[in-house]
């Protein structure tokens, strides 16, 4: 795991191994799995692997984090641990663009919620309006099916 997180900062940003490892340990603690630092990815649960991926991305100090269905391949028990990390990132004002079907998560942390259908933007709104008073019929149908 440690090598997985430190490789890009050392190769791309040119930081020292010691600095990269210190930051990696801090990031693993931030995502709630500091004890996994010296394990192999194959020894981790799906939720732990996803949190390592988040730590790896954060190691590069991105301005924006992109997530494409970060919980889609996880067992139901693992979904909460990944969403909890993402909620913490949102509280720390990390800018995120998240593709998700986790509507409770979107309602809780999003500044804007956007619905696309067949490549077309259907609705973009605040979570309150999007979920409680959507402007478009397609959004209403989507919410009826998924909520």
Q: Which residues fall in each region the model found?
A:
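H-loop/switch region of ABC-family ATPase nucleotide-binding domains
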Residues: 100-101
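A short, proline-enriched helix->beta-strand linker immediately N-terminal to the Walker B motif
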Residues: 59-63
């Amino acid at each position: 795991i440690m090598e997985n997180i430190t490789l890009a900062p050392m190769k791309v940003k040119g930081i020292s191994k010691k600095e990269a490892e210190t930051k990696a340990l801090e990031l693993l603690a931030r995502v709630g799995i500091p004890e996994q630092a010296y394990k192999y990815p194959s020894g981790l649960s799906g939720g732990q692997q996803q949190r390592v991926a988040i730590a790896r991305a954060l190691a590069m100090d991105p301005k924006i984090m992109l997530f494409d269905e970060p919980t889609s391949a996880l067992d139901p028990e693992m979904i909460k641990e990944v969403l909890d990390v993402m909620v913490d990132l949102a509280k720390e004002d990390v800018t995120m663009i998240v593709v998700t079907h986790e509507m409770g998560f979107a309602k809780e942390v999003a500044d804007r919620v956007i619905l696309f259908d067949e490549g077309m933007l259907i609705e973009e709104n605040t979570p309150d309006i999007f979920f409680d008073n959507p402007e478009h019929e397609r959004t209403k149908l989507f919410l009826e099916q998924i909520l």
